């Protein structure tokens, strides 16, 4: 879809590329945010927002957008939809079992091949977690919105400050639930 806002979009890349150049490009986006910075800076400069609200930014965008907003003095609110910030493979599951090993040491994603049961994918997930770590993300983000108290508690367990975690539950109207 072509629209006026295209000039702000991140460069499109394939995360399922088979060739070496494509794989390097995808890894560079995931670990360093390559292909995002210039256009997002332009967006911040031209739009001058008071707040940036982030959702599902890993891979296609990158946590670099939180850093860029922070550097310009723009407040950053980040709604969480998974456990990516404390578990490099997103789910707190390892081979079907609950796992919290990465809360304190991200190397477990590699040792257990948690990402797609693949050593290379797990190394990439580890690199991403090491670069976009809780110290940086907590500094750049004013508030993380958690859809449940459980998630907020897990985020705290993973080292995120309670003062930055807000619980706003997802819900539907009671009249929409059939018992």
Across the structure, where does each feature detected by a protein language model lie?
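Carbohydrate-associated surface elements
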Residues: 150, 171
């Amino acid at each position: 879809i072509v629209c006026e806002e295209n000039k702000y979009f991140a460069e499109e890349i394939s995360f399922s590329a088979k060739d070496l150049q494509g794989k390097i490009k995808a890894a560079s986006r995931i670990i360093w945010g390559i292909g995002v910075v210039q256009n997002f800076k332009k967006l911040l400069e031209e739009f001058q927002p008071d707040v940036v609200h982030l959702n599902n930014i890993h891979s296609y965008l990158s946590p670099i957008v939180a850093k860029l907003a922070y550097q310009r003095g723009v407040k950053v609110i980040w709604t969480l939809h998974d456990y990516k910030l404390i578990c490099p493979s997103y789910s707190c599951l390892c081979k079907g079992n609950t796992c919290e090993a990465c809360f304190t040491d991200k190397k477990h994603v590699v040792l257990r091949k948690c990402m797609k049961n693949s050593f290379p994918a797990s190394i990439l997930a580890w690199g991403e977690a090491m670069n976009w770590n809780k110290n940086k993300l907590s500094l750049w983000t004013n508030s993380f919105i958690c859809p449940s108290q459980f998630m907020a508690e897990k985020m705290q367990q993973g080292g995120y400050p309670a003062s930055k975690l807000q619980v706003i539950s997802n819900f539907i109207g009671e009249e929409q639930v059939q018992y």
